[in-house]
């Protein structure tokens, strides 16, 4: 990742996607999550406060170290274990059929090969698993 992508973009996204007017959308996309969840594009952890009690674990995929630093306060307050588990939604480091649900919020439009990322999500979701997403660019 270049300097702009690594240092500037995560902060812009944190501010733009962290506004109060998107909280109802975050709440809605997260409300039916349950079990073991993979979140691609974890960013600065803005979904963490909206994980329902039915979520047992989150494997968070995020390329930006800055995003992780911005997530620190939310991660410390999380009621669900969240682990950084990879950097690339196009190549998920998990076995097939590992997750009950996938989560992506305003991320798919930023992935260079979204079809590959969606295939990867399908691969790691258990049969009957669900993908929960909100997007502005698809």
Language-model segment annotations:
Residues 133-135:
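Acidic carboxylate diad motif detector
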Residues 1-20:
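Class I SAM-dependent methyltransferase Rossmann-like catalytic core
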Residues 38-91:
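Class I SAM-dependent methyltransferase SAM/SAH-binding core
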Residues 87-102:
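A short acidic, Gly/Pro-enriched loop at the edge of an enzyme's catalytic core
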Residues 100-113:
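A short SAM/SAH-binding and catalytic strip from SAM-dependent methyltransferases
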Residues 16-36, 46-50:
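Conserved alpha-helix/loop element of class I SAM-dependent methyltransferases that forms part
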Residues 115-130:
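A short glycine-rich, Lys/Arg-flanked "PGG" loop and its adjoining helix->strand segment in the class I
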Residues 35, 56, 100:
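Conserved acidic residues
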């Amino acid at each position: 990742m270049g300097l702009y992508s690594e240092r500037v973009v995560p902060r812009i996204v944190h501010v733009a996607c962290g506004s109060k007017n998107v909280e109802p959308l975050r709440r809605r996309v997260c409300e039916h999550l349950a079990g073991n969840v993979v979140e691609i594009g974890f960013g600065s952890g803005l979904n963490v406060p909206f994980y329902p009690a039915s979520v047992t674990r989150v494997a968070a995929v995020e390329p930006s170290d800055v995003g992780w630093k911005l997530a620190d306060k939310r991660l410390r307050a999380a009621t669900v274990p969240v682990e950084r588990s990879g950097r690339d939604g196009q190549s998920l480091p998990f076995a097939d059929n590992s997750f009950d649900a996938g989560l992506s919020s305003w991320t798919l439009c930023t992935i260079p090969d979204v079809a590959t990322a969606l295939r990867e999500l399908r691969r790691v979701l258990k049969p009957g698993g669900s993908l929960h997403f909100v997007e502005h660019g698809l």
